Regions:
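Two-metal-ion RNase H-like nuclease active-site motif
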Residues: 211-214, 348-352, 422
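Charged catalytic cores and adjacent phosphate/nucleic-acid-binding surfaces used
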Residues: 218-354, 363-374, 379-380, 385-415, ...
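Glycine-biased, low-complexity coil/linker segments
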Residues: 2-4
Length: 591
């Protein structure tokens, strides 16, 4: 399908703000996520324009339900579509319009009367549709630049419903958004790169191709996809110049920039075959790494592999993911690099949610999917009671869930489900639930979910109090960050890690591609202090199990080993860990 022409009405920037509206897909390939994006935007624009709030809410609910459907709408007949919860006659007809024409006429009309800057405000944390409506209709502000200026002039604080605190938060969010324009999550660009590279290799089977730069180093966010090849420049151009709206630019040093619509930029590093591996090596490492390398070592004239480059210089091979700092070269010189973790090393799923709280799949479905994927155990950690927005479990529901787990464990042996909870760290640092309830869990993941805008002192008091709680087993997503969207609250990482070492608390590496939290830069220090880490998917569906791959990739950057990763423990090792942990916990509780 081509682009919906009506969506052009708000200008080209709309492509960048809501790329799913412009994705070139055939009608039969429109996914549930793309359909949900359209309805979510429709709901928000209706609220901004002050239209029927009941209908707006129904479209918002439809977007939420569509995104979580286990089956693609394109595979449903009318009877199946209209039986989906929250999809009535009106919404169902709009879905049919969207999947048959590629656009929504009602959304087109709203986009035609909405300034680009207002649409862009939807990307700013802390600004919902109703606040945006006030900014637009009452303050006559239509761009982010105008809004930033108004904040600097202290005008937003004077508007009813905002205040000084909201104004400061909005200003920070605008600056964070602007700083991150042009960056992409590694998980997103890796998927695109994995589609492009085989096509190139198939088209030119006798040439060499490799990812390089930040994407090869598995950085959590990257600006573009770096590719090195010995392919002729004109052939690279020919491969892409037939794609509509694609711009190709030449740069010095045999670089070619390919800019395709709604895709990350491709940066080709072109080289002759003789120097392919030396150029692969030099284009992979960070500036700090390469500077340190050239201070002490030499490149062989025509290396046949990267391994040869390292061995010629008396260095242990350094995986591409770890070529960030100068320090890693000294470890390679000392032959002290350990084998880093792989996704296959993960034996169990720790941190997952079911339909008991805000998950998509039932507990049994989660367990059976884990079995099918070869995992030995599942730690189910639904949200605690204070998380009302996520259907958090009351004490009574905790007891009922534990009964279901007991039943399933009898049924699914030798696979085992462990009783856990993602307990909210409250404002004072205490955990949700009293000790009688906390005692019933096999392990507790303690996480901050509310009041994320904290000073360093407040954040440290809150987190350290939770870490010192004898029932805390794992500190979940320690900073609360959302990559390219929300900066984490401030922490003194060393003090937090030291406290985890003192209290035998595991630190989570949340594997969700938008979290990857704790930051990989602190993994080495945690291991030095004897702190276990745990690559956990924070899975809210069976598909979420796949995120352990991204957790393993980011953990490689910090040099994490399987023996230092809790989720790499076998079932027997994990049970032994929990038993020893409970003994230590009891000694603290009754001390």
């Amino acid at each position: 399908m081509g682009e919906g022409p009506g969506y052009e009405c708000s200008g080209n920037k709309l492509r960048n703000i809501f790329p799913s509206l412009f994705t070139e897909y055939s009608l039969i390939s429109m996914t549930n996520y793309e359909i949900a994006d359209h309805f979510s935007l429709l709901s928000k624009l209706m609220d901004i324009h002050g239209e029927n709030s009941f209908k707006s809410k129904s479209y918002s609910n439809a977007a939420f339900n569509i995104e979580k459907l286990p089956k693609e709408i394109r595979e449903m007949d009318d009877a199946e579509l209209f039986s989906v919860r929250g999809i009535g006659e009106n919404t169902g007809q709009k879905i049919k319009e969207l999947v048959t024409t590629g656009k929504l006429s009602q959304l087109e009309k709203l986009l035609a009367t909405t300034p680009e800057g207002i649409l862009e405000m939807l990307q700013i944390k802390g600004l919902g549709p109703k606040k945006i409506a006030v900014i637009w209709k009452e303050m006559s502000i239509e761009t982010l630049g105008e809004l930033e200026y108004a904040c600097n002039e202290n005008r937003l604080a004077a508007v009813k419903g905002f205040g000084a605190k909201t104004q400061e938060n909005v200003l920070q969010s605008i600056r964070y958004y602007q700083q991150n324009q042009g960056f992409h999550l590694w998980a997103e660009v890796e998927a695109i790169a994995n589609a492009i590279m085989p096509q190139l290799q198939k088209a030119y089977p006798n040439n060499l191709f490799s990812l390089t730069g930040g994407i090869r180093r598995q950085l959590e966010t990257v600006e573009w996809i770096d590719i090195i090849s010995d392919l002729d420049k004109e052939k690279v151009k020919a491969q892409f110049e037939t794609i509509a709206d694609t711009a190709i630019e030449e740069e010095p040093n045999e670089r070619l920039i390919v800019k395709m619509p709604n895709q990350p930029t491709l940066k080709f590093h072109l080289t002759d075959t003789t120097h392919y591996y030396t150029n692969l090596f030099t284009s992979t490492g960070s500036e700090e790494f390469m500077s340190a390398f050239f201070d002490k070592y030499q490149l062989p004239e025509a290396a046949k592999s990267e391994e040869e480059i390292f061995s010629t210089n008396g260095l242990q091979y350094i995986p591409a993911a770890m070529r960030e700092t100068a320090d890693i070269l000294q470890k390679a010189a000392d032959n002290s690099l350990n084998e880093i973790i792989k996704a296959e090393d993960i034996k169990g799923i720790i941190h997952s949610h079911s339909t008991w709280s805000d998950g998509l799949n039932t507990l049994e479905q989660m367990a059976k999917a884990a079995i099918d994927k070869g995992f030995e155990y599942l730690v189910i950690s639904d949200h605690s009671q204070v998380a009302f927005y996520a259907n958090g479990l009351s004490a009574e529901r905790v007891a009922a869930q534990h009964q279901e787990i007991d039943t399933l464990n009898d049924k699914l042996k030798p696979f085992k489900i462990f009783k856990s909870i993602e307990a909210d760290i409250l404002g004072d640092g205490n955990l949700d639930y009293n000790s009688r309830v906390l005692e019933t869990f096999d392990l507790v993941i303690a996480s901050v979910h509310s009041n994320l805008k904290m000073s360093l002192d407040k954040a440290m008091d809150r987190v350290l109090t939770a870490v010192s709680n004898p029932y805390t087993t794992i500190l979940g997503h320690p900073t609360g960050r959302l990559l390219l969207s929300r900066a984490g609250y401030p922490l003194d990482h060393k003090k937090v890690i030291d406290a985890c070492a003192e209290n035998n608390v595991v630190i989570e590496i949340n594997a969700h591609p938008r979290r990857l939290d704790i930051d990989w830069r602190w993994i080495e220090y945690a291991m030095e202090r004897g702190v276990l880490l745990s690559i956990d998917p924070d899975a809210h569906s069976v598909n979420g199990f796949n995120d352990v791959y991204y957790g393993a990739m980011i953990a490689q950057k910090g040099g994490l080993t399987a023996k230092n990763n809790l989720s790499s423990f076998t079932l027997a090792e994990f049970e032994n860990f929990l038993e020893k942990y409970k003994e230590k916990k009891r000694s603290k509780v009754f001390a």
